[in-house]
Design a protein with these regions (language model features):
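Conserved SAM-binding loop of SAM-dependent methyltransferases across substrates and taxa
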Residues: 2-16
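Mobile active-site "lid"/loop adjacent to the S-adenosyl-L-methionine
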Residues: 23-25, 45, 64-93
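A structural alpha-helix within SAM-dependent methyltransferase catalytic domains
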Residues: 7-10, 56, 91-95
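C-terminal catalytic and target-recognition region of SAM-dependent MTase-like enzymes
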Residues: 103-155
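Helix-to-beta-strand junctions that scaffold the AdoMet/dcAdoMet cofactor pocket
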Residues: 98-99
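Conserved beta-strand segments of alpha/beta enzyme cores
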Residues: 15, 40-42, 130-132
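S-adenosyl-L-methionine
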Residues: 21-64
């Protein structure tokens, strides 16, 4: 499923940028694009926060932003980070480059970002927009409920 959201956006004729700091994930996503018989996704090997900061300086706006950040990671230049430390900056910059009629979807998988924190940050950065925050659950093969993160959707 790597790059699935990018492929879906491209299949709807959206100009699509796929940003990831992990080259291997970009390679897999590109392969999925080709298997889906799509083309012209812009592949950006960079930290998403740095990309958003640069786009803000350029004055670029986006009709849609889909973020699926890991709970922690190592950036393109080997810098270590944790989502809970970068969440405010990430949401702030995303809010600034999101068109006023655009949408944003953000999944979080860090156990340190609970629903109330995500809602609080959404209020900080999207208070004039309609948004919702929900928990993500799935059924296991044995029928048990498994919590795996939270979702922010800005409309």
């Amino acid at each position: 499923y790597t790059g699935a959201a990018s492929c879906m956006a491209k299949s709807r004729d959206a100009m699509t940028f796929h940003v990831d700091s992990v080259k291997q994930l970009i390679s897999w996503a590109r392969e999925n694009m080709e298997l889906s018989e799509l083309e012209d996704i812009k592949w950006v090997h960079e930290d998403a926060l740095k990309f958003a900061q640069r786009e803000l300086k350029r004055g670029n706006k986006y009709d849609g932003i889909i973020m699926d950040p890991p709970a922690w990671g190592i950036g393109a230049k080997k810098e270590r980070w944790k989502l809970e430390d970068k969440l405010d900056d990430l949401m702030s910059n995303a809010a600034k480059i999101l068109d006023k009629k655009g949408f944003l979807i953000m999944n979080t998988y860090s156990p340190k970002i609970d629903l109330s924190l995500l809602e609080s940050k959404a209020n900080d950065h999207f208070s004039k927009r309609n948004f919702e925050v929900v928990e993500l659950w799935m059924k296991t093969a044995t029928g048990k409920d498994l919590f795996y993160g939270n979702l922010l959707r800005v409309k």
